[in-house]
UniProtKB/Swiss-Prot annotation:
It holds the Pfam family Glycos_transf_2. This is Spore coat polysaccharide biosynthesis protein SpsA. The gene is spsA. Belongs to the glycosyltransferase 2 family. Monomer in solution. Disulfide bonds join C155-C243. Keywords: Disulfide bond, Glycosyltransferase, Transferase. Pathway: Spore coat biogenesis; spore coat polysaccharide biosynthesis. Glycosyltransferase implicated in the synthesis of the spore coat. The lineage of its organism: Bacteria, Bacillati, Bacillota, Bacilli, Bacillales. CDD domains: Glyco_tranf_GTA_type (cd00761). The keyword Disulfide bond applies.
């Protein structure tokens, strides 16, 4: 069985997905399986993905979902991640998106950290984000640090910077009935909602190195949500829950 299960979600990012997949398959640590969970992307994106399927570490799954209404009935990336978790065989679980780049030693360094520190169930690294305009020019650069142990991770950490033991998921599902929350009320902050669940049991331990790079583009769901574009997708979403709500509820529980 592989040591690590990497779960990548994908949807219509033909300009970026090849770089994302390549950054994972070229890791210095090779004992992993990669789930590419595609949400029925266009043919252009699928043509980019297909050459990578010859690698025996890759497991590709494509949904048959269609239509805006169906896409807003659940937080789609959470549903895809839950599907992958049910199939995952790794001792450790980590995440990626189709516009996220792993640094070459990301898996090696995070596996080493968990192997060396059995008391740590969840770790996270620092990460860099490039914000791109419609011409794909970098207009802003930000860094999320990894400086402290936290019992209040929602909206402070990106899920592409996290690795955790599979056993974390078992505790989460036992308490909440699922791994990631698929409610569309958390479309904006699906990873924050998952971290909220995890923080009921475990703190997040820092690994103070930049081990992944993210792109925020006009193709991303988060761009659409944060810019509040009045498109059909946004109009069909229910009112969105927020970071403050999650963080305050953890504080009331004595977490952070």
């Amino acid at each position: 069985m592989p040591k690590v299960s990497v779960i990548m979600t994908s949807y219509n990012k033909s300009d970026y997905v090849a770089k994302s997949i390549s950054s994972i398959l070229s890791q210095t640590f090779s004992d992993f399986e990669l789930f590419i969970m595609d949400d029925n992307s266009n043919e252009e994106t699928l043509n980019v993905i297909r050459p990578f399927l010859n690698d025996n570490r890759v497991r590709f799954y494509q949904s048959d979902i269609s239509g805006v209404k169906e896409r807003t009935e659940k937080t789609r990336y959470a549903a895809l991640i839950n599907q992958a978790i049910e199939m995952a065989e790794g001792e450790y679980i980590t995440y990626a998106t189709d516009d996220n780049i792993y640094m070459p030693d990301r898996l090696l360094k995070m596996v080493r950290e968990l192997d060396t520190h059995p008391e740590k169930a969840v770790i996270y690294s620092a990460s860099k984000t490039y914000h791109l305009n419609e011409n794909r020019d970098i207009v802003k650069e930000t860094v999320r640090p990894a400086a402290q142990v936290t019992w209040n991770a929602p909206c402070a950490i990106d899920h592409c910077s996290v690795m955790h033991r599979y056993s974390v998921l078992e505790k989460v599902k036992e308490k909440f009935g699922s791994y990631w929350d698929e409610s569309p009320a958390f479309y904006r902050i699906g990873d924050a909602r998952f971290f909220w669940r995890v923080n009921h049991f475990y703190p997040f331990y820092p690994l103070d190195e930049e081990l992944d790079l993210n792109y925020i583009t006009d193709q991303s769901i988060h761009f659409q949500l944060f810019e509040l574009e009045k498109n059909e997708f946004v109009r069909n979403l229910p009112p969105q829950r927020n970071c403050r709500e999650l963080r305050e509820s953890l504080k009331k529980l004595g977490m952070g």
